[in-house]
C-alpha cells in the first residue's frame, strides 16, 4: 500500500514523488483529482524557473510576459523530450508520388489526419513528449528528402489545411512542433529544376544549381549537375546564389506564418556551408524576435566536433551520433566504458570536455538506422537503455513505435524503418519510458545538470547530474542479475524519482536486473 505521508506529499505537489507512486495511488485510492498537482509543470522544479513543458498558448508579447514566462519561451528546448514521426511512413503513403491524389475525395487523400483521428496526439502527450519532430511533409518525388514543392503538403498526405489541423492539435496538447528543413538538395521533380531541364541555360533558375553544361546526367539531360552523395535524383542546391537563399528564407517564414511551427530540423546540416548556416541562424533569430519565443534549429550531424554546427551563429543543437553508437554498443558488448567515455568526453567537468552546458539531441534510433529493438542483442535491456537515454545529458528523442518495441532492419532499404502503423500501442516499455520522461521533467538536474562519473563496470554505470544545488544519481544495471553497487554518493539517503521510494546508500545500493534508478540526493 501507499503511506498516508506519501499521499500528502502528492497532494502538496511534491516534485520528488515518482510517477510510479502516483500511478499506484491513482489505482489504489482513486485520487485522480488530487494527484494532478504533482506533475503540473508549474509545481515542478523546472516550472518554478520557467523551463516547464510547452504550453498551448504562448505569451506573444514580451511586455506581457512575466520573467518566468519569458524564460520558458526562450529556453523551452533544453528541457524538451522530442518525439519523431516520419509521416509518409506512419500514415501509409505510397512509396512514390504520381501526383494523382490531391486531397479531395476520400480518407486516403487525407492520410495526415490519422495523427489526429487515430489517437497519436493523445499518445504523444501521455508519453510525456513536449515536442514533435515531423519529417518531410511537403511535395516530393518519393521519400520526402527529394522535394518538389516546399509550399504544398505532399499529395499522398493531404492538404495544407490538414497539416494546420495536425499542428494545432499538438499545440493544444501543449506539444511544440518542428518541421524537417531539407535545404541542401531537392528532387529532380523540383519545379525550378524542371524549368532548367526545359529551358537549359535560359532558365532564370539555372544559377540555383551547380550545372555542368558540357556534361551529361544518367537521365540524358544534356547537362551534368552536382548531386548529394552521388545520388543522381538528389540535386544539390547552390547556396552561393542569393535569389535561391531569398526564396528559401521565404519558405521558412511562410511555414512559421502559415503553420505556427516552433523550429526546424536541418537535414544533412553537416553538408551545409557555414555561411549558409549563419544565414539560417539570422532567419531563426528574426522569427524568435517576432514570436517572443526561441525558434529552434537542430542540425543533423554525424561525427566530428559538433561545435562546428552548434553555436550562436549556427544551430542550437546537433544530432549526437557519437553517443548513439555508444548507447547500443555498450549494451551488446557488455562494455559500459564505451558510453561512459563518450559522456565524459562530451559533458564532463574538465576544461577539455567538448559540449558541457550544451544540449545535443540524443536517441537510440531514428528513420535512418535500425530500430533499437532489432539492434540490441538482449531485448531485456531496452528499459535500462531508455533509462540511460533520459538520464544522460542532452535532449532525448524517441522514434515513433520504438516506445513499444517494434523492430526494423535496413536489409531492403529504409522502408522497414518507416512502417505504416494504425493506432499507437502501449506496453510495459512504454509505461517505463513515460515514467523516465516524467521524472526528468521534474528535475532541473536531469534536464540542465552537469555530468560526473561515479562508477563504471562492464554492465553497470553510475553517474551524477548536478544543477543549482540539486544532485541526481543515475544508476544503470544492464546485467541479467541483480547486483549491489558501492560508490561515494556524497549523502546518506535519496528518493527515487521514478518509483518514489526512499533509498539508503549506507550498506551499498542494491539494484535489480536490467534496472535504472534516478536517485534525488538529500543534502
What positions do the PLM features span?
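Aromatic/acidic polysaccharide-binding cleft in carbohydrate-active enzymes
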Residues: 312, 358-380, 385-427
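Carbohydrate-binding surface patches
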Residues: 454-488
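C-terminal beta-strand-rich structural cap/linker in extracellular carbohydrate-active enzymes
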Residues: 505-523
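DNA major-groove recognition helix of helix-turn-helix/homeodomain DNA-binding modules
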Residues: 18-37, 180
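Active-site-proximal helices and loops of the catalytic beta/alpha 8
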Residues: 167, 171, 197, 257, ...
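Short, charged recognition helix plus adjacent turn
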Residues: 36-70
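Aromatic- and acidic-residue-enriched segments that line the glycan-binding/catalytic groove
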Residues: 143-155, 183-222, 310-322, 416
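N-terminal structural segment of carbohydrate-active enzymes
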Residues: 73-179, 184-186, 191-195, 230, ...
Amino acid at each position: 500500500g501507499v503511506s498516508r505521508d506519501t499521499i500528502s506529499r502528492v497532494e502538496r505537489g511534491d516534485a520528488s514523488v515518482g510517477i510510479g507512486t502516483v500511478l499506484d495511488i491513482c489505482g489504489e485510492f482513486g485520487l485522480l483529482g488530487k494527484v494532478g498537482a504533482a506533475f503540473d509543470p508549474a509545481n515542478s522544479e523546472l516550472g518554478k524557473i520557467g523551463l516547464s513543458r510547452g504550453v498551448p498558448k504562448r505569451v506573444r508579447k514580451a511586455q506581457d510576459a512575466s520573467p518566468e514566462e519569458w524564460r520558458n519561451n526562450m529556453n523551452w528546448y533544453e528541457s524538451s523530450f522530442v518525439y519523431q514521426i516520419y509521416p509518409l511512413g506512419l500514415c501509409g503513403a505510397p512509396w512514390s508520388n504520381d501526383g494523382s491524389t490531391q486531397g479531395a475525395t476520400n480518407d486516403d487523400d487525407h492520410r495526415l489526419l490519422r495523427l489526429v483521428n487515430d489517437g497519436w496526439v493523445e499518445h504523444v502527450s501521455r508519453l510525456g513528449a513536449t515536442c514533435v519532430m515531423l519529417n518531410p511533409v511537403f511535395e516530393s518525388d518519393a521519400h520526402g528528402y527529394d522535394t518538389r514543392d516546399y509550399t504544398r503538403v505532399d499529395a499522398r498526405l493531404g492538404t495544407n489545411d490538414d497539416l494546420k489541423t495536425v499542428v494545432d492539435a499538438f499545440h493544444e496538447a501543449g506539444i511544440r512542433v518542428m518541421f524537417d528543413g531539407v535545404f541542401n538538395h531537392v528532387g529532380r521533380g523540383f519545379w525550378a529544376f524542371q524549368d532548367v531541364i526545359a529551358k537549359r541555360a535560359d532558365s532564370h533558375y539555372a544559377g540555383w544549381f551547380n550545372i555542368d553544361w558540357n556534361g551529361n546526367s544518367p537521365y540524358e539531360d544534356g547537362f551534368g549537375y552536382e548531386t548529394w552523395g552521388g545520388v543522381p535524383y538528389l540535386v544539390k542546391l547552390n547556396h552561393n546564389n542569393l535569389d535561391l537563399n531569398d526564396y528559401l528564407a521565404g519558405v521558412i517564414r511562410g511555414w512559421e506564418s502559415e503553420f505556427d511551427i516552433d523550429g526546424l530540423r536541418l537535414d544533412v546540416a553537416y553538408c551545409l556551408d557555414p555561411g549558409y548556416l549563419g544565414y539560417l541562424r539570422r532567419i531563426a533569430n528574426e522569427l524568435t524576435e517576432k514570436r517572443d519565443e526561441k525558434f529552434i534549429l537542430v542540425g543533423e550531424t554525424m561525427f566530428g566536433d559538433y561545435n562546428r554546427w552548434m553555436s550562436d551563429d549556427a544551430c542550437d543543437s546537433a544530432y549526437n551520433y557519437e553517443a548513439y553508437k555508444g548507447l547500443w554498443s555498450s549494451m551488446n558488448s557488455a562494455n559500459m566504458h564505451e558510453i561512459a567515455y563518450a559522456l565524459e568526453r562530451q559533458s564532463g567537468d574538465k576544461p577539455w570536455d567538448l559540449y558541457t552546458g550544451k544540449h545535443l539531441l540524443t536517441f537510440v534510433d531514428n528513420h535512418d538506422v535500425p530500430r533499437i529493438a532489432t539492434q540490441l542483442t538482449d531485448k531485456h535491456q531496452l528499459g535500462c537503455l531508455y533509462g540511460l537515454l533520459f538520464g544522460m545529458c542532452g535532449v532525448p528523442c524517441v522514434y515513433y513505435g520504438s516506445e513499444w518495441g517494434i523492430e526494423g532492419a535496413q536489409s531492403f532499404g529504409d522502408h522497414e524503418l518507416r512502417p505504416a502503423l494504425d493506432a499507437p500501442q502501449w506496453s510495459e516499455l512504454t509505461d517505463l519510458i513515460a515514467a523516465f520522461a516524467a521524472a526528468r521533467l521534474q528535475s532541473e538536474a536531469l534536464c540542465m545538470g552537469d555530468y560526473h562519473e561515479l562508477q563504471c563496470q562492464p554492465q553497470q554505470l553510475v553517474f551524477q547530474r548536478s544543477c543549482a544545488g540539486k544532485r541526481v544519481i543515475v544508476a544503470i544495471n544492464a546485467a541479467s542479475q541483480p547486483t549491489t553497487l558501492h560508490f561515494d554518493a556524497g549523502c546518506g539517503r535519496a528518493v527515487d524519482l521514478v518509483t518514489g521510494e526512499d533509498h539508503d546508500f549506507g550498506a551499498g545500493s542494491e539494484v535489480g536486473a536490467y534496472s535504472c534508478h534516478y536517485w534525488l540526493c538529500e543534502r
